Amino acid sequence: MPLSSEQLAEIDAQRAHTAPTRRVVSPGMESHLYRAHPVLDHGFVRVIDYMGDDAAICQAARVSYGTGTKSVQNDEGLIRYLMRHWHSTPFEMCELKLHVKLPVFVARQWIRHRTANVNEYSARYSILDREFYIPAPEHVAAQSAVNNQGRGEALQGEEAARVLEILKADSARCYDNYEAMIGQEGQQGLARELARMNLPANIYTQWYWKVDLHNLFHFLRLRADAHAQYEIRVYAETMCRLVADWVPFAYKAFEDYRLGAVNLSAQMVDSLRRMLAGEAVTQETSGLSAREWREFQDVIGR
């Protein structure tokens, strides 16, 4: 995570500034404000601002005038009830603003979550840095034989080295040509908005991303899942740690009822009940497709 001395000084200056407030403050999140949490080889996640805490969720749910009830146990129980029964608007009262540095191909997955406010670094106005995501050897993998969207076994030895060399060489060559097209001093050069088209998808971009807690939980449920692509999953895992410090009751409920939970179809529930009753249920008698049956077996640990 190469932050320049100027960037580090700016972060230190931001963290040194304090101000009196009547706003709700989350002590756990205050410790993360402005700090860069490294992700991948050049990326990071920074908390720029936040609004609300666990008590704000309860306040919204009760439409109360003050803080939630004085009983911490009651607040935690209410939050777990709201999460368990799929309530959304109380969680939307909390918001988080992040500064994220990430590869472009990760950003294209991320931006599919359309329930956030985003402002991205503009390559029309500025020249992008020479920073590319190059996966570690253990993450250079073949295509999965059973999942069109996933990876299989990691490539080994010379094959992995060959792929990594191609990635590094292509990235360097594309950036060299990008610089050459923009032009040197005394040359007119190509417009930045056109020169950027030649850059590869593993170059890093940056954005500010603001989202409410309900939609953030939806993002994390999908992107922190073991089936998510590694490169976006590590960002989601970093964000999970931040959210756990920000709203610990809400995050624990999210872990229990979303992240660590599973959804079973009506046929799966019926099959499970029959199994518990002692019946030998097979894929053919379950009413499930082969893929559904395989997923069901994974859930029940068979």
From Swiss-Prot:
Reactions catalysed, as given in the entry: dUMP + (6R)-5,10-methylene-5,6,7,8-tetrahydrofolate + NADPH + H(+) = dTMP + (6S)-5,6,7,8-tetrahydrofolate + NADP(+)
Signal sequence extent: none
Motif ThyX motif per record, residues: 112-122
Binding site for dUMP: 109-112, 120-124, 196, 223
The protein's annotated pathway: Pyrimidine metabolism; dTTP biosynthesis
UniProt cofactor(s): FAD
Enzyme class: transferase
Record EC number: 2.1.1.148
Residue ranges annotated for the ThyX domain, each copy included: 43-257
Active site per the UniProt annotation: 223 (involved in ionization of n3 of dump, leading to its activation)
Residues the entry annotates as binding FAD: 89, 112-114, 120, 212-214, 218
Annotated GO MF terms: flavin adenine dinucleotide binding; NADPH binding; thymidylate synthase (FAD) activity; thymidylate synthase activity
GO biological process: dTMP biosynthetic process; dTTP biosynthetic process; methylation
Origin: domain of life: Bacteria
CDD domains: ThyX
SUPFAM superfamilies: Thymidylate synthase-complementing protein Thy1
Comment on bound cofactor: Binds 4 FAD per tetramer. Each FAD binding site is formed by three monomers.
Pfam families, sorted: Thy1
UniProt entry keywords in alphabetical sequence: FAD, Flavoprotein, Methyltransferase, NADP, Nucleotide biosynthesis, Transferase
Quaternary structure note: Homotetramer.
Main function: Catalyzes the reductive methylation of 2'-deoxyuridine-5'-monophosphate (dUMP) to 2'-deoxythymidine-5'-monophosphate (dTMP) while utilizing 5,10-methylenetetrahydrofolate (mTHF) as the methyl donor, and NADPH and FADH(2) as the reductant.
Entry-linked NCBIfam families: thyX (TIGR02170)
Similarity-based family: Belongs to the thymidylate synthase ThyX family.
Protein name: Flavin-dependent thymidylate synthase
Organism encoding this protein: Ruegeria pomeroyi (strain ATCC 700808 / DSM 15171 / DSS-3)
Gene: thyX
